[in-house]
């Protein structure tokens, strides 16, 4: 478990609109404040990822995601599948709330969300009081970095803080499913 100074340093960077690198269930992720357009644009520039692709939000609990999700549109018969799958490395693509910014959804009217079971990410989201943008720590189309040293070599001074904690132990990135019909996009 991360010590408080590590979490505090990461939270300070997030609050200042910086991008952090942190461990997730399977890979290192790049993250920032989802409500800060400049921070999200900075993250996309670092990753060389087009905004049209949309991003994932990772949270400590579903309540943190409600601002971004049109919860009323999620079919009643899919809710048990969704909520029983969390916390875990399962990302669900849900209808986006009307006010969810396009810098998060890209070209879509949906938002990809996950409630994590990774202790460091849970603490980050708890202390920050909201979800984080979560995208794999790599340049778009390249392999994900496998260590903090590799991340520092690839991203140099572009990252505000490197949360040097262990990965969660999963060997594959999160499964991504459609909350409306259960279809697997990535499994």
From Swiss-Prot:
* Alphabetical list of InterPro entries matching this protein: DHBP_synth_RibB-like_a/b_dom, Sua5-like_dom, TC-AMP_synthase, TC-AMP_synthase_SUA5
Does the keyword tRNA processing belong to this entry?
Answer: yes
Residues in YrdC-like domain copies: 4-187
**Might you name a Gene Ontology BP term for this protein?**
tRNA threonylcarbamoyladenosine modification
- Keyword list, A-Z: ATP-binding, Cytoplasm, Nucleotide-binding, Nucleotidyltransferase, Transferase, tRNA processing
Q: Which PROSITE patterns match?
A: YRDC
According to UniProt, the reaction catalysed is: L-threonine + hydrogencarbonate + ATP = L-threonylcarbamoyladenylate + diphosphate + H2O
The superkingdom of the source organism is Bacteria
Tell me the enzyme class: transferase
Q: Does the keyword NAD apply?
A: no
GO CC annotations on file: cytoplasm
| Pfam families given in the database record | Sua5_yciO_yrdC (PF01300)
The EC number on file is 2.7.7.87
Disulfide bridges in this chain: none
Give compartment(s): Cytoplasm
The main location is cytoplasm
- What is the recorded function of this protein according to its Swiss-Prot or TrEMBL entry? Required for the formation of a threonylcarbamoyl group on adenosine at position 37 (t(6)A37) in tRNAs that read codons beginning with adenine. Catalyzes the conversion of L-threonine, HCO(3)(-)/CO(2) and ATP to give threonylcarbamoyl-AMP (TC-AMP) as the acyladenylate intermediate, with the release of diphosphate.
Instruction: Describe the family membership recorded for this protein in Swiss-Prot or TrEMBL.
Output: Belongs to the SUA5 family. TsaC subfamily.
Q: What is this protein called?
A: Threonylcarbamoyl-AMP synthase
Q: Which organism is it from?
A: Pseudoalteromonas translucida (strain TAC 125)
Upper lineage ranks?
Bacteria, Pseudomonadati, Pseudomonadota, Gammaproteobacteria, Alteromonadales
């Amino acid at each position: 478990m991360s010590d408080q100074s590590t979490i505090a340093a990461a939270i300070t960077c997030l609050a200042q609109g910086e991008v952090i690198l942190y461990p997730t269930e399977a890979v290192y992720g790049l993250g920032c404040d989802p409500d800060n357009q400049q921070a999200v644009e900075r993250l996309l520039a670092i990753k060389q990822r087009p905004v049209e692709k949309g991003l994932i939000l990772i949270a400590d609990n579903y309540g943190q995601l409600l601002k971004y999700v049109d919860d009323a549109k999620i079919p009643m018969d899919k809710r048990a599948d969704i909520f029983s799958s969390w916390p875990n490395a399962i990302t669900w693509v849900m209808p986006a709330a009307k006010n969810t910014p396009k810098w998060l959804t890209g070209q879509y009217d949906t938002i990809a969300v996950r409630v994590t079971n990774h202790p460091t990410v849970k603490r980050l989201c708890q202390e920050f009081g909201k979800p984080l943008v979560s995208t794999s720590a790599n340049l778009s189309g390249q392999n994900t970095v496998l260590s903090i040293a590799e991340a520092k070599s690839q991203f140099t001074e572009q990252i505000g803080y490197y949360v040097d904690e262990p990965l969660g132990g999963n060997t594959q990135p999160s499964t991504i499913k459609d909350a409306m019909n259960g279809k697997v996009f990535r499994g």
